[in-house]
């Protein structure tokens, strides 16, 4: 699919979302799930967690015919617990490790903004790293720009769709977005238009719920309406 869409000048950025939102991984390998923070969190204190995730990324990135053929790879890093300082530092080290890991395959790393939520002392690489700026409480955009990240503006309060969930949008408020919003507005933070550290904007559709009557066609209608 990446090759087909690239030929049509559409870039697919594949994502393996770790170390949270990782139930697909812990269902397969329960021993790397966190007993303290829930099985959707990987246990960052176990060496086998890194062995497994390293091997998973390698499976998609290495060889003469890799699955991920584009120039960018998303490593997730969304919504991990910040309950304790030691786990925050582990999360920051994990993030830095996988930024550098995918760069080792010639890819540009993309992450979800989380480093204000996970504020700590462990350095996380920022040079040539793209960050989805989705919620300013998780990643303050001014701080992230100062730290050297390139941002994609995707503020959840304006451009998140969760079909028939009762929170966020069911359909985007397109007239408002067209008339009032630009990617320079990230939550309540406003930057100069065409700021060199803001690459552009995106919207997201998240299928948080199954069995609520929403079909693939319904999802497409929300995207293309």
Positions of predicted regions on the chain:
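Active-site beta-loop-alpha junctions enriched in small/polar residues
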Residues: 15-21, 78-80, 114-117, 134-136, ...
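Carbohydrate-binding surfaces of carbohydrate-active enzymes
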Residues: 104-106, 115, 213, 225
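Hydrophobic faces of well-ordered beta-strands that scaffold small-molecule active sites
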Residues: 12-16, 73-75, 109-111, 129-133, ...
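Substrate-binding cleft of carbohydrate-active enzyme catalytic domains
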Residues: 4-105, 109
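Short glycine/threonine-rich loop-to-helix capping motif typified by GTGT followed
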Residues: 81-94, 121-136
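Alpha-helical scaffolding within the catalytic cores
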Residues: 55-62, 117, 138-139, 186
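Flexible, acidic glycine-rich loops studded with aromatic residues
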Residues: 122-129, 136-225
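Acidic, contiguous N-terminal accessory segments
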Residues: 109-118, 125
């Amino acid at each position: 699919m990446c090759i087909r869409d690239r030929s049509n000048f559409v870039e697919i950025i594949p994502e393996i979302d770790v170390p949270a939102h990782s139930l697909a991984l812990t269902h397969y390998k329960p021993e790397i799930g966190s007993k303290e923070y829930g099985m959707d969190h990987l246990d960052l204190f176990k060496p086998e967690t890194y062995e497994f995730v390293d091997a998973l990324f390698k499976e998609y990135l290495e060889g003469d015919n890799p699955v991920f053929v584009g120039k960018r790879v998303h490593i997730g890093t969304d919504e991990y617990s910040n309950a304790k300082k030691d786990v925050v530092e582990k999360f920051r080290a994990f993030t830095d490790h996988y930024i550098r890991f995918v760069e080792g395959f010639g890819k540009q790393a993309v992450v979800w903004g989380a480093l204000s939520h996970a504020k700590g002392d462990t350095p996380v690489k920022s040079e040539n790293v793209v960050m989805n700026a989705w919620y300013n409480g998780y990643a303050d955009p001014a701080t992230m720009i100062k730290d050297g990240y390139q941002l994609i503006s995707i503020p959840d309060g304006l451009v998140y769709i969760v079909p028939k969930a009762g929170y966020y949008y069911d359909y985007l408020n397109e007239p408002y977005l067209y008339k009032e919003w630009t990617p320079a507005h990230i939550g309540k933070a406003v930057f100069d238009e065409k700021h060199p550290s803001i690459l552009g904007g995106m919207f997201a559709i998240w299928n948080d719920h199954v069995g609520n009557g929403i079909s693939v066609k319904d999802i497409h209608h929300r995207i293309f309406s």
